């Protein structure tokens, strides 16, 4: 199947350290070589800053504008070649795009051909915000009735599930719901889809990161006091204390632990966890 990587933070942070190890699994240290993708939510004032992997610098900006536009911008990269060899993936490994919510995916095709339109993460608009979704699993006999504007472009079970999730969210809420209200609805939708097969997924609208576990999904919270971390898939390590301050908090979610010396917490099958500002809130 596939592998997932997500990041949720309380301040814009780059994911170059984590993505470097993750991308090696896309055809080098593992066999997920059928495409990859990554999406970064950004506020109006964010951009690319000079820095080291997973640094946490924030540009000066107007607070009112930031609150209004926080996380509404999106940078989205996909490629149907392997992440371990893709020049675009190499760009992401070296380009410190800062974001509070990131979703990445490396694909091992089970349904749908190897093609650009079948690469995760997928993107849709709802309530004036972008929504990003990536899935690891294999859904069988899942054929929901779709209507309205949410329809898949490619031929994967994953994008079909995403279209259904978006449709049901729109049907369930007359106005723009809160993160807590969305979490309740998403638990109901996930419980409806999960009987069709493994349904590990990451979902974000730029305000929160939702992670649903079916088989394998882990998370780690990085906060003060920060320590060293060493990647499993590359001979790379970092001292986070050199690139952070005491208020920074970062949650990383992944299919299999990326580092060998951090405490990765396994999520329970059927569990939907929501992260806001780098910590679990529900």
Model-derived features with residue positions:
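Extreme N-terminus nucleophile/cap motif
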Residues: 1-83, 270-272, 278-282
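Gly/Ser/Thr-rich active-site loops/lids in small-molecule metabolic enzymes
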Residues: 154-157, 215-238
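Catalytic core of PPM/PP2C metal-dependent serine/threonine phosphatase domains
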Residues: 101, 176-215
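Short acidic (Asp/Glu) patches
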Residues: 80-92, 106-128, 145-148
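Glycine-rich phosphate-binding loop plus the immediately following alpha-helix
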Residues: 141-143, 147-172
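Conserved beta-strand-loop-short alpha-helix elements that form
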Residues: 2, 131-141
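Glycine-rich phosphate/ribose-binding loops and adjacent secondary-structure elements
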Residues: 139, 204, 270
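A conserved acidic, glycine/proline-rich C-terminal tail/linker
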Residues: 228-271
